[in-house]
Regions:
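Gly/Ala-rich beta-loop-alpha elbow adjacent to hydrolase catalytic centers
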Residues: 89, 93, 97
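Conserved alpha/beta-hydrolase catalytic His-Asp/Glu region
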Residues: 121-124, 136-195
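Short beta-strand/loop motif that positions the catalytic acidic residue
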Residues: 196, 202-204, 208
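Flexible "cap/lid" loop of the alpha/beta hydrolase fold
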Residues: 98-103, 107-137, 142
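Catalytic histidine-centered segment of alpha/beta-hydrolase-like enzymes
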Residues: 234-243, 247
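Conserved HGGG/HGGXW glycine-rich cap/lid loop of the alpha/beta-hydrolase fold
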Residues: 7-59
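Catalytic histidine neighborhood in serine/cysteine hydrolases
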Residues: 217-237
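Conserved acidic catalytic loop of the alpha/beta-hydrolase fold
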Residues: 68-85
Length: 258
């Protein structure tokens, strides 16, 4: 478990309460663009970063574990001299958030878990996807990924943005994507969910084929201070498809627990 210095961007009030945004497999920090203005206008200090192996972050050889990705977060907080943060994670980012909540709870004010899962099998599916990406590049999985990320209606209404997200996935380093698949393949956070002490908001997309609402329900049922919100129409990147609703939910959660 050796941390790397991930690429990050800080926006908003330097003295505001820090909010860390952690993204999905195949994305970079641009996926959180719909949240930045709402959070900074409300006075928060917003930290976005690229997962290791993604965007402009280093790409160490894989496989990676969730503990590796969590160590990157703790190192980033240390680098920015942030003792505790509000953590918002989507998909892989939510898994990282649950790991931090279980193993470093003193670093969290609150936890927001969007479109994620505590256990996402079968492992063979992730191994197969990693093998495809290593052999053919991330472009080979980009089109299928955006079909999971957004509902057909949203893709039809936003063809240019859909292409931008497909290009984002295709530009992800193959080794980084495949190595993060390994982290998901070996992950099972279920048994330790009751150890998460942070007030937790769990958000599910009603139309999410990647992490359906039942996955969010299992998390919300097991985390002591959790509440569940299911929103729609929204697939896997609910923060992009329903930014107004997601922003209101996040801001409400942060204000209730400030």
């Amino acid at each position: 478990m050796t941390a790397v210095d991930v690429h990050y961007v800080v926006e908003g009030s330097p003295d505001g309460p820090p909010v860390l945004l952690s993204g999905s497999l195949g994305s970079d920090l641009r996926m959180w663009a719909p949240q930045v203005a709402a959070l900074t206008t409300a006075g928060y200090r917003v930290v976005r970063y690229d997962q290791r192996g993604h965007g402009r972050s280093p790409v160490p050889p894989g496989p990676y574990s969730l503990a590796d990705l969590g160590a990157d977060v703790l190192a980033l907080l240390d680098r920015l001299q942030i003792r505790r943060a509000h953590f918002v994670g989507l998909s892989l980012g939510g898994m990282v958030g649950m790991w931090v909540g279980q193993y470093a709870p003193h670093r969290l004010h609150t936890l927001t878990l969007c479109c994620t899962s505590a256990e996402l099998g079968p492992p063979s599916g992730w191994a197969d996807r990693a093998a495809t990406v290593r052999a053919e590049g991330t472009g080979a999985v980009a089109e299928a990924a955006v079909q999971r990320w957004f509902t057909p209606q949203w893709r039809a209404a936003h063809p240019e943005r859909t292409r931008d997200f497909q290009d984002m996935i295709a530009s992800t380093p193959a080794e980084g994507y495949a190595a993060c698949c390994a982290a998901i393949e070996t992950m099972d956070l279920t048994a330790r969910l009751p150890k998460i002490s942070a007030p937790t908001l769990v958000v599910a997309g009603a139309d999410d084929p990647a992490t359906p609402p039942a996955h969010a329900q299992r998390i919300a049922d097991a985390v002591p201070l959790a509440r569940l919100e299911i929103i729609g129409p929204a697939a896997h990147l609910a923060n992009v498809e329903q930014p107004g609703i997601v922003n209101d939910l996040i801001l409400g959660h942060l204000k209730e627990n400030s």
